[in-house]
């Protein structure tokens, strides 16, 4: 029996909680389904009507991440895993449609099975887990689901969290239900965490300290796209002249757009802008706003280029990182919205591009502080944004300094991946083929 395993009553109460949460969110789900067309492809698998199949023979390693960023960080680890353990079959799941689409794009060419994780109701998830029968579970950053992991553990799987983190808010919620917190994490065999702060939070919830290792943040370890051929390729594809400046506004939310529209209007120089909304269903709203400002724009889906337009809206998923490499400056969205707290601050650095972001970075405050202390990023506020952008565009040597510091940051952090991999190998079970 798994230490700390929940009773049938715990499972029943947990299922009741999920049903209650689902009913509370149902109006929003229906709105997105019928107004924005979301969830059309995922309902069958989410409710267990469609059973995923994993072709081939051999043990199964099941990797899971909540959404786009969490699944993307699995790529280098999974590539290494497939190279050193070719007898294993691999599965990658995500909780969101955007995460699944990105996972399919990244992992599909590698022969990896990808699908959206079904709802964690015991009656739905347990038959799926039994059908796949994984020998290894790998959770990106800690997006564990109780019925999912408990059923896999019952079948003998090993479970490990990589790049693990626990926010202060999540820690508070688990602390209120401390006993529940212990049960939540007790089935996990290993915790490979980002830093000591996250370790302290897991310990506070009663996780066995022998299970925990601080291996570093592996979001910093992906293939760098900053080589000249990448930059030149994307600038040529976008039809950008050599002396034309490009500002990429990545993963922007409405509040980011609200800040940037007057800035772009005021700058009005030899500057092109690539708008990448966090949610592509907001592309129509962005089109209306640009039209209102008399800004000439085209759509990425229509193969628009800057030869005809001053702005391009990227109305497709999965292109942001490649397009960052063409930029002279890259802004990371969600950082002018205090409800969001920012997205992946590292992607511009990995593309060899100067990083700028707004003041709301609470979702990754530790990382932002490290970047700022090293001079690898620039934090803007609404009062100085035009002045700072103008200064950076007028002084290429300042942009070059940001790029250099960013490269140093990534080089120093690369060792985190090596530490994570060496620790992760200890949890890969020896399975008879």
Curated annotation (Swiss-Prot):
A GO BP term here is: lipopolysaccharide core region biosynthetic process
Identify the residue position(s) of the site Transition state stabilizer.
Answer: 141, 219
Q: Which domain of life is it from?
A: Bacteria
Q: Which reaction does it catalyse?
A: lipid IVA (E. coli) + CMP-3-deoxy-beta-D-manno-octulosonate = alpha-Kdo-(2->6)-lipid IVA (E. coli) + CMP + H(+); alpha-Kdo-(2->6)-lipid IVA (E. coli) + CMP-3-deoxy-beta-D-manno-octulosonate = alpha-Kdo-(2->4)-alpha-Kdo-(2->6)-lipid IVA (E. coli) + CMP + H(+); alpha-Kdo-(2->4)-alpha-Kdo-(2->6)-lipid IVA (E. coli) + CMP-3-deoxy-beta-D-manno-octulosonate = alpha-Kdo-(2->8)-alpha-Kdo-(2->4)-alpha-Kdo-(2->6)-lipid IVA (E. coli) + CMP + H(+); alpha-Kdo-(2->8)-alpha-Kdo-(2->4)-alpha-Kdo-(2->6)-lipid IVA (E. coli) + CMP-3-deoxy-beta-D-manno-octulosonate = alpha-Kdo-(2->8)-[alpha-Kdo-(2->4)]-alpha-Kdo-(2->4)-alpha-Kdo-(2->6)-lipid IVA + CMP + H(+)
- Keywords, comma-separated and alphabetical: Cell inner membrane, Cell membrane, Lipopolysaccharide biosynthesis, Membrane, Signal-anchor, Transferase, Transmembrane, Transmembrane helix
* Signal sequence annotation: none
What SUPFAM superfamilies does this protein map onto?
Answer: UDP-Glycosyltransferase/glycogen phosphorylase (SSF53756)
**Active-site residues annotated for this sequence:** 70
Membrane topology, from the record: Single-pass membrane protein
Which ranges does the record mark as transmembrane? 11-31
Q: Which GO terms describe its molecular function?
A: Kdo transferase activity
User: Which Pfam family name is an example for this entry?
Assistant: Glycos_transf_N
Principal place of residence: membrane
Compartments where found? Cell inner membrane
EC assignment? 2.4.99.12, 2.4.99.13, 2.4.99.14, 2.4.99.15
Record-listed CMP binding positions: 277-278, 317-319, 344-347
Please name the pathway. Answer: Bacterial outer membrane biogenesis; LPS core biosynthesis
Give the Gene3D superfamilies listed for this entry.
3-Deoxy-D-manno-octulosonic-acid transferase, N-terminal domain, Glycogen Phosphorylase B
Q: Name one GO cellular component term.
A: plasma membrane
Name the family the entry cites. Belongs to the glycosyltransferase group 1 family. Glycosyltransferase 30 subfamily.
Q: Which PANTHER family match?
A: 3-DEOXY-D-MANNO-OCTULOSONIC ACID TRANSFERASE, MITOCHONDRIAL-RELATED, 3-DEOXY-MANNO-OCTULOSONATE CYTIDYLYLTRANSFERASE
Q: What does this protein do?
A: Involved in lipopolysaccharide (LPS) biosynthesis. Catalyzes the transfer of predominantly four 3-deoxy-D-manno-octulosonate (Kdo) residues from CMP-Kdo to lipid IV(A), the tetraacyldisaccharide-1,4'-bisphosphate precursor of lipid A. Thus generates the genus-specific LPS epitope of Chlamydia, composed of the trisaccharide alpha-Kdo-(2->8)-alpha-Kdo-(2->4)-alpha-Kdo.
* Protein name stated in the entry: 3-deoxy-D-manno-octulosonic acid transferase
